[in-house]
Amino acid sequence: MSQNKKVVLAYSGGLDTSVAVKWLQEQGYEVVACCLDVGEGKDLAFVQQKALQVGAVQSYMIDAKEEFAEEFALTALQAHTMYEGKYPLVSALSRPLIAKKLVEVAEKENAVAVAHGCTGKGNDQVRFEVSIKALNPDLEVLAPVREWKWSRDEEIDYAQKHGIPIPINLDSPYSIDQNLWGRSNECGILEDPWAAPPEGAYDLTTPLEKTPDTPEIIEITFEKGKPTAIDGIQYSLSDLILHLNEVAGQHGVGRIDHVENRLVGIKSREVYECPGAVTLLKAHKELEDLTLVKEVAHFKPIVEQKMAELIYNGLWFSPLKGALDAFLQETQQNVTGVVRVKLFKGHAIVEGRKSPYSLYDENLATYTKADEFDHDAAVGFINLWGLPTKVNSIVNKKEQVKA
């Protein structure tokens, strides 16, 4: 391989990607590290410097929290994306954004390749590589961890030999990924689907036994499907989600224990914490119920399921995803209003909703004297609505008589 070929590495600061810097150098590459802040709470300045210490020639630290919130989490919210009905797509949402930034840095640096730290067993390798190829088919994609196939002990030996710092949390049994939409946790005792997750597996949510005994009421304002304020206070979308993570998390909202079907064909037990996401998803759905006509409200879940599958399966940049985005955007035009939510003992309970575009007419719905519904019109409607069933019954009875 000729010298001075650049590769842009998605760098997390952990053992795998730190070792990958040195390993890629041994393959003849100059390594440019790319560190993204998508709301995981890490000290990104420290991670940026660590990349340089372990041998990267350049280290980018990109604050992508607001872009992640506006372009990725908001789509997940408006599409109510819950993979297999339970998983709000925490990690799956950040991967296309990370891929996008890797490609942008690679093009800026005239790199010939990008690299990630995924193993050959998970979903993320697919999400990264499919996204990268969709954005720039000319870039080579390298997967050092998948290629070297070392055991943990062999990796540690390599790190010590090359003076690479060993993370202090290396003994943790868990594999954790976090962004502002939530936190995922796997491995260790969680690999046993019968074992109850220990409290040490959680970080964003309070155990139910320790949550406040008094509920907290909040009001969330939406404008065209986008949450903009809590209790009348305006927030950027990223700050709003992070604030809700804290508020709802204190009440134990958003714990999810799920055995899911991975893209690569295996089942995996995952524990998720998504206090802000779960609260927003419930509030947004209730506002849609108030403002969408029945036909749209009944059809939209079909789109939502497909959208969740596309995102989970790494097809964010696919043509179908783009087409579904257009439908989704159209459905949000009147999803404006305020939703009142009670947070209590692990639950986010919607207790009220209002909108200038509300399709709920109290005078039509009421059973009091104010009722304006035309009851006489019901007779003709029922006759026409049931006509096909009635005709079918008449015809079949005639045939039975002939027999």
Swiss-Prot record:
The keyword Kinase does not apply. L-citrulline binds at residues 87, 123, 127, 175, 184, 260, 272. The keyword Calcium does not apply. GO terms for biological process: argininosuccinate metabolic process; L-arginine biosynthetic process; urea cycle. ATP binds at residues 10-18, 117. It is found in: Cytoplasm. InterPro entries: Arginosuc_syn_C (IPR048268), Arginosuc_syn_N (IPR048267), Arginosuc_synth (IPR001518), Arginosuc_synth_CS (IPR018223), Arginosuc_synth_type_1_subfam (IPR023434), AS_cat/multimer_dom_body (IPR024074), Rossmann-like_a/b/a_fold (IPR014729). It catalyses: L-citrulline + L-aspartate + ATP = 2-(N(omega)-L-arginino)succinate + AMP + diphosphate + H(+). One of its GO terms (cellular component) is cytoplasm. GO terms for molecular function: argininosuccinate synthase activity; ATP binding. Pfam families: Arginosuc_syn_C, Arginosuc_synth. Its EC number is 6.3.4.5. HAMAP family: Arg_succ_synth_type1 (MF_00005). Belongs to the argininosuccinate synthase family. Type 1 subfamily. Homotetramer. NCBIfam families: argG, PRK00509.1. This is Argininosuccinate synthase. It comes from Bacillus pumilus (strain SAFR-032). The lineage of its organism: Bacteria, Bacillati, Bacillota, Bacilli, Bacillales. The gene is argG.
